[in-house]
Amino acid sequence: METIAKHRYARTSAQKARLVADLIRGKKVAAALEILTFTNKKAAALVKKVLESAIANAEHNDGADIDDLKVAKIFVDEGPSMKRVMPRAKGRADRILKRTSHITVVVSDR
């Protein structure tokens, strides 16, 4: 049984979050949580929270055994970017993109 959890509009770029997602793809959830606990990146905390939510969803909604679960799929899509202005010298301005992402974790007992 596949169970999904999503974090939409996460305040990190998809490029940075994908680095963390690649670390746990296909792993057992216990090993994945351990990897995320000791990964020194902001995105690791966000991905860990989504993974814990997916595990809780599987246990509560589907009655799955946590020991059998593995990360079947994990992907990070780009969300909308917030445009901001950074003042520069001589009256100019640069545009800053505050990027967001959508993190999706699918756990499965198969």
UniProtKB/Swiss-Prot annotation:
GO terms for molecular function: rRNA binding; structural constituent of ribosome. PROSITE patterns: RIBOSOMAL_L22. InterPro entries: Ribosomal_uL22, Ribosomal_uL22_bac/chlpt-type, Ribosomal_uL22_bac/org-type, Ribosomal_uL22_CS, Ribosomal_uL22_sf. Coiled coil: none annotated. The keyword Ribonucleoprotein applies. The keyword Ribonucleoprotein applies. GO terms for biological process: translation. Pfam families: Ribosomal_L22 (PF00237). GO terms for cellular component: cytosolic large ribosomal subunit. CDD domains: Ribosomal_L22. Part of the 50S ribosomal subunit. This protein binds specifically to 23S rRNA; its binding is stimulated by other ribosomal proteins, e.g. L4, L17, and L20. It is important during the early stages of 50S assembly. It makes multiple contacts with different domains of the 23S rRNA in the assembled 50S subunit and ribosome. HAMAP family: Ribosomal_uL22_B. This is Large ribosomal subunit protein uL22. The lineage of its organism: Bacteria, Pseudomonadati, Pseudomonadota, Gammaproteobacteria, Pasteurellales. The gene is rplV.
